[in-house]
């Protein structure tokens, strides 16, 4: 979570702390990039999607980020339509967000980021409130953005659904890198080793 907050600029903009080292996005020091520019490049899906909602209805929420880019209404409508088609969530259109299940809320949070077409996606514990079907759908969405050449950074304890998608798995313990694995190397770890690391 801390790393995702560093990459999206929430640290040090909104969360204080001592930072040692540098965080670079596209070769630029993150602390030198205005938040509006970071938001155009980096999309974040938080562990609890309710904390990132600004609207009551799903279509307005999906359009919120691109609306702030001052796109014409026709372009907004087209992008919302394209987003819901790409992510197969047409059935969630024009719904009250607060009547959705946890998994459906997560899909809307992801869709609102996807609509902005960022180069970098940050997801914080995205599977934590999802059932098996929703986790499979999340994996499909991640596969889609990976095919589009996007960079995806995920903070997660459940890794089983990511092992075929991940290029690299970085294991952190108390803020220190304890291991870097390819997907294949991670699959070779025993169940005992993964449990000892607190991973599933």
Where are these regions (language model features)?
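Conserved ABC ATPase "signature" region
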Residues: 74-92
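Conserved beta-strand-loop-alpha-helix hinge in the C-terminal portion
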Residues: 176-199
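Conserved ABC ATPase signature
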Residues: 96-100, 104
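Conserved ABC transporter NBD signature motif
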Residues: 16-28
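Hydrophobic anchor residue at the start of the ABC signature
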Residues: 110
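Catalytic Walker B motif of ABC-type/P-loop ATPase nucleotide-binding domains
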Residues: 121-124
């Amino acid at each position: 979570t801390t790393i995702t907050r560093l990459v999206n600029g929430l640290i040090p903009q909104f969360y204080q702390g001592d930072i040692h080292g540098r965080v670079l996005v596209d070769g630029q020091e993150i602390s030198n990039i205005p938040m509006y520019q970071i938001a155009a490049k980096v999309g974040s899906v938080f562990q609890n999607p309710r904390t990132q909602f600004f609207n009551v209805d799903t279509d307005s929420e999906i359009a919120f980020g691109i609306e702030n880019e001052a796109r014409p209404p026709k372009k907004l409508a087209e992008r919302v339509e394209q987003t819901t088609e790409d992510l197969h969530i047409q059935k969630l259109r024009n719904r009250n967000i607060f009547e959705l299940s946890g998994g459906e809320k997560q899909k809307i949070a992801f869709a609102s980021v996807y609509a902005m077409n960022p180069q970098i996606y940050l997801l914080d514990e995205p599977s934590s409130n999802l059932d098996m079907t929703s986790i499979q759908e999340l994996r499909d969405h991640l596969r889609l953005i990976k095919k589009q050449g996007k960079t995806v950074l995920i903070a997660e304890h459940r890794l089983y659904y990511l092992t075929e998608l991940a290029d690299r798995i970085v294991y952190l313990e108390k803020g220190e890198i304890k291991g870097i694995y390819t997907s294949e190397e991670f699959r070779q770890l025993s169940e005992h080793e993964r449990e000892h690391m607190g991973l599933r």
